[in-house]
């Protein structure tokens, strides 16, 4: 089997394709959540806290000197990243919880009893005939 044929079979397996789709959708969802946090949630939150822009929160570890830029710890960006994570985690938790609920409901549906085989039908008829003879 040639290398390209093996690779094609590997790449076209359902799990690999599903994983690729999941990664692409996850990346797009991450950008949407980042925009939601940065552009929708944080501005009103900053306004409620007195017009604060969280991106500007930082500690100066070393001031700028000449051509050397300042060394800062941007904890405001970290706060935004934490909000991003919490929203993504809630969305994933909700999706998994819904999937588990649907899976449980599907599993709880009782399976239809199997239809009796021909042998079972014949045995039931013989049993019924024997019972009828004993009652006479």
UniProtKB/Swiss-Prot annotation:
Sorted UniProt keywords: Cell inner membrane, Cell membrane, Ion channel, Ion transport, Membrane, Transmembrane, Transmembrane helix, Transport
Membrane-spanning segments: 10-30, 76-96
GO molecular function, one term: mechanosensitive monoatomic ion channel activity
Broad class of where this protein is predominantly found: membrane
GO CC annotations, alphabetized: plasma membrane
Coiled-coil regions, chain positions: none
Mode of membrane association: Multi-pass membrane protein
Annotated compartments: Cell inner membrane
Pfam family, one: MscL
Domain of life: Bacteria
Subunit structure: Homopentamer.
Assigned protein family: Belongs to the MscL family.
Entry function: Channel that opens in response to stretch forces in the membrane lipid bilayer. May participate in the regulation of osmotic pressure changes within the cell.
Protein name: Large-conductance mechanosensitive channel
Source organism of the structure: Yersinia enterocolitica serotype O:8 / biotype 1B (strain NCTC 13174 / 8081)
Gene: mscL
């Amino acid at each position: 089997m040639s290398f390209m044929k093996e690779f094609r079979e590997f790449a076209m397996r359902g799990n690999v394709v599903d994983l690729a789709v999941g990664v692409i959708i996850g990346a797009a969802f991450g950008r949407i959540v980042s925009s939601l946090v940065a552009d929708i949630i944080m501005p009103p939150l900053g306004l409620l806290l007195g017009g604060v822009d969280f991106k500007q929160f930082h500690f100066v570890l070393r001031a700028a000197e000449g051509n050397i830029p300042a060394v800062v710890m941007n904890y405001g960006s970290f706060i935004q990243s934490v909000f991003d994570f919490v929203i993504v985690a809630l969305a994933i938790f909700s999706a998994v919880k819904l999937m588990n609920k649907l899976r449980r409901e599907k599993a709880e549906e009782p399976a239809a009893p199997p239809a009796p085989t021909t042998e079972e039908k014949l045995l039931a008829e013989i049993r019924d005939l024997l019972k009828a003879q004993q009652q006479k």
